[in-house]
A protein has these predicted regions:
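PRPP-associated nucleotide enzymes
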Residues: 1-350
């Protein structure tokens, strides 16, 4: 088997002493939240526990904002957008966290999350550089009508970007970002895809975690990534290890990216800090920041296993292949992202 392995110990050496102190301080604050969670779980009518949880969440939010303000390559949606927009982001995250949110509804809110994140990561940065889109309408009386819409011009970035997919949880989010580029571009650009089969060793704990890149089940060409804007869209950034493993491999084989963006729905503080310390050209964009990881390296409070909730669990002894994963999204998703599906199929077959 042709595999590349990165150890967690290789990542922590890049954290500064200030980073480590900040991570420890947030852990200490989150202990108050855990205490309130235990009391609520024991008695759901405990109003004092709920008030304590709300107060703890506010304290943690202020601390995370303070920490992120010192790192200009970590972008948290609710820390950088007007207050009026925070309610929508909070509602989306709450629905995704809810264990009662079913598969189709979970897909819907992931789509909403990545539409917001595309606007924040790309479109909003081009508000001063707009183009006119002339759109035909169905109205023909007294003549065929056309409407003018000014939209951010993202053509240059659309043409230079490659969607780098960390299978399997990042498959649909990457398709969503690609379609946003297509819809914003003046020439219907379909971004190319590079597919990386990577997973954590779930038998390990956060402190000694291994990240395994399976090259035999990955589909990419190094020369097509060199000098490009590499975009990774993964719902969850817990430790940052998977992204770092891939980028280190690419750089060791001569790839020099123009830029790297990691776009998440939820990022843990430690994962965001690690990425920006290890990869000098990387920027992390996240809709929400959660404070800590548990010893299994899962984000707290988190939303569970995003890969399983997006794709369903593998039932057989072998994991599903790319085409099976896409088919399991259902016809509505496949039809909506048909151009992206075709591009992914080309990547796999070639």
């Amino acid at each position: 088997m042709n595999k590349i392995i990165l150890h967690a110990q290789d990542l922590d050496g890049f954290l500064t002493e200030g980073d480590k102190k900040n991570i420890e301080s947030v852990h200490a604050l989150y202990e108050k939240s855990l205490d309130a969670c235990r009391r609520i779980d024991n008695d759901n009518s405990d109003c004092k526990a709920k008030d304590d949880l709300s107060a703890s969440a506010a304290e943690i939010g202020d601390k995370l904002k303070e920490i992120c303000s010192t790192n200009d390559r970590i972008h948290v949606y609710s820390f950088e957008t007007p207050r009026e927009q925070h309610g929508e982001a909070s509602r989306i995250i709450a629905k995704l966290r809810n264990p009662e949110t079913g598969h189709e509804e979970f897909l819907y809110y992931i789509q909403r999350a990545y539409e917001l994140m595309f606007a924040h990561s790309f479109a909003d940065k081009n508000l001063n550089n707009k183009r006119a889109m002339i759109q035909m309408t169905p109205v023909t009386n007294p003549c065929r009508n056309y409407a003018v819409h000014k939209i951010p011009d993202v053509d240059e970035l659309a043409h230079s970007s490659v969607m780098c997919v960390m299978l399997r949880g990042a498959l649909l989010p990457s398709m969503i970002i690609s379609k946003e580029f297509q819809d914003y571009s003046s020439d219907d650009t379909i971004t190319p895809f590079a597919l990386f089969k990577i997973k954590r060793d779930e038998s390990k704990k956060e402190s000694n975690m291994d990240y395994v890149l399976d090259l035999d089940r990955s589909f990419f060409k190094l020369e097509e990534l060199d000098g490009k804007d590499l975009i990774f869209a993964d719902p969850m950034n817990a430790t940052g290890g998977s992204l770092v493993t891939i980028v280190k491999y690419l750089k060791e084989h001569g790839v020099k990216p123009r830029s790297i963006k990691f776009i998440n729905v939820i990022s843990a503080l430690k994962g965001a800090l690690r990425i920006t310390r290890v990869i000098e050209e990387a920027e992390v964009y996240t809709l929400w920041m959660d404070p800590v990881l548990n010893e299994q390296a899962y984000i707290l409070p988190g939303l569970g296993d995003a890969g399983d909730r997006l794709n369903g669990e593998d039932k057989g002894p072998e994991p599903r292949n790319m085409i099976q994963l896409i088919a399991d999204y259902g016809s509505n998703i496949v039809n909506l992202y048909r151009d992206q599906v075709i591009e992914i199929e080309k990547t796999v077959l070639n």
